[in-house]
Amino acid sequence: MIKIVSLINCKFNNANILDGSTSKVIKIPLSLSNLNREIMKLLLTGCTGFIGRELIPSLIKEGHSLTVISRQSKGQLKTIANDQDINFIQMNPAESSSWNKEEIQNALKSCEGVINLAGEPIAEKRWTDAHCKEITNSRLETTKNLIKNLRNLKKSPKVLINASAIGFYGSNPQTEFTEENIPGNDFLANLCKEWESIAKNKPRATRLLIVRIGIVLAKDGGALGKMLPIFRAGLGGPIGDGKQWMSWIHRTDLCNLINASIKNSAWSGVVNGVAPNPVRMNEFSNSLGQVLGRPSLLAVP
């Protein structure tokens, strides 16, 4: 793991990482707090999983009109929001023919903003050749198809928020990385580099913000969701020697970052979606153990 910081100057509150309602929630700078509450028609890809469980309700709360496209069934979406709040289109966005449907073309023509988080989860399965291919295609082919269709529109959306990952920087644990650093040269770094390059072919009139997302934490899933049962059983501890950096972000912060990015036309380019102060794995494990009243002694190889 590597140490990632962001050059974006947002202030955070100090709070418990286990509680999304009081986690280190981004304070929107004063220049943003006075913005009018612009209601937009948004098209979302890849938002029916761990991040989407909080992102979609937060966008609905802001008053945005949502069209969500996903390979998942509509039943999966019902666990996130009510049917009446969302226009749902089931399709595989990595297949170019899926974009020919009248329903998705109409949604594209009317959308004012796009949030592209599509991608097979990286940490859920072993990295077999087949899974690495799925990780790659679900991101690159989806984004290629999205960009191609956006460029064909007579009226371009105002903004495209495209996911990337801190894996962009490779795996040098001795270096502190900011948005200005060059990419690494391993599988994830090359994937993120190509993913971002495709997104940059967006329509000229569309503002692009690429969010290089860190390790996303929330108690109902992701890395923290896997760690909590182990720690609660008294079997928790750091991974490896505990000296590796953990550049994390709470899911609530990430959703706030995306919401703020929609509103603020001054935000473009690349931002590291991480908390301002990365921690060593030892420190994170010790803090988690203290919060739960459990030991953090058993290192995971």
For the regions a protein language model found, what residue spans apply to each?
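Mid/C-terminal beta-alpha module of Rossmann-like enzyme folds, strongest
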Residues: S261-P301
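Catalytic helix-loop patch of NAD(P)-dependent Rossmann-fold dehydrogenases
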Residues: N137, E141, S171-I210
